[in-house]
Amino acid sequence: MTHMSNYGNDRLALYTFESVVKFLRCWTNVRLASAPPLALAEKYFQLRPDELNPLWGNPCDDIRHRRIWSKSKWCDTLPKILVIGPQKTGSTALYTFLAMHPTLVPNLPSPTTYEELQFFNNNNYLKGLDWYLNFFPPSQGNSTQILFEKSATYFDGDLVPRRAHALLPNAKIIAILISPSKRAYSWYQHIRSHGDPVANNYTFYTVITANDSAPKHLRDLRNRCLNPGKYSHYLERWLAEYSSHQIHILDGSLLRSEPAAVMNTLQKFLKIPHLDYNKLLKYDPKKGFFCQVTSNEKTKCLGKSKGRVYPPMDEVSTKFLRRYYTQHNTALSKLLVRLGRPVPQWLKDELSNG
């Protein structure tokens, strides 16, 4: 498209098209034909299926684009931190803890998905950049303000790493890992408690052992239980887009048992002023995890849907998942060593028991 080099200027270089057509007709045997725009688009995307979906970039990265962008919009309203999950690893708790920090500002809540925007991994992406920006408050000239977003479905989204990097190449990425077996069981119990008919009609063991000839609804639930726990596979996808120095891999078990220590380490990674979370978090024996300390020295905990106590996983499922994740856990351990990151205790335990 010859007009692309003029994007942001005041002309489309139509004369260039005319000159090319005249040259081809005069000096070549190429036969030119025309077609309606929709037919041309279909032919183009048959040749370039990788371009079928848009890939949003930051308009402020190019001075020409910035000049034609609305003056009512801000270049600093995009997040600099992404909490990517996966689901059922403690991402909502981390979101809450991060929002306590005076430097960090979360996205505004979505009317349908609450604190998660889920922009990069579903049809919200097709709503465009303006839709995304509307969930972030302007900085109001405060250069110390850092925006962040949390969507736990980002971790294992096939298109997410590339889309995120195209728009937020300098962002810092936070992933939370717990035992993949516990994560799978927690997800099953989570949707079961929300009345999911598949989870209510099939046992956990039936779900995780379903083969590819099983009904689609059963295979879909199996995949949502098992696939996000293949941690090394998805981390490699993120590492293909982002530098390892931009990715923080957080131990979800420690986040639950020693949140203040985890937040201290995380603050160093984010390079933000230190905040003593020992004074902000207190263990609540009724909930079974740490909660925010309020001004009257009481605790403010997450909602009833968080921290539920489920029946223990049955022994048959435990053994199956231990075998199932052995290869993936081994790959994760090697990846962490390669990156110079600590191997969490839960991973050491699972490998020794495998």
Regions found by a protein language model. Give the residues of each.
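PAPS/PAP-binding and catalytic site of the sulfotransferase fold
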Residues: 13, 20, 92-101, 160-169, ...
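PAPS-dependent sulfotransferase catalytic domain
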Residues: 126-140, 195-265, 269-279, 323
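Catalytic grooves of carbohydrate-active enzymes
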Residues: 1-31
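Acidic-and-aromatic substrate-binding clefts and catalytic sites of carbohydrate-active enzymes
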Residues: 7-11, 120-129, 152-158, 226, ...
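Generic structural signal for small/hydrophobic residues in well-ordered secondary structure
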Residues: 90-91, 132, 148, 164, ...
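PAPS-dependent sulfotransferase catalytic core
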Residues: 37-152, 167, 171, 181-202, ...
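The conserved 3'-phosphoadenosine-5'-phosphosulfate
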Residues: 40-45, 236, 240-327, 342-354
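Short catalytic/ligand-binding loop motif for oxyanion handling, primarily in non-cytosolic enzymes
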Residues: 5-9, 92, 155-158, 180-186, ...
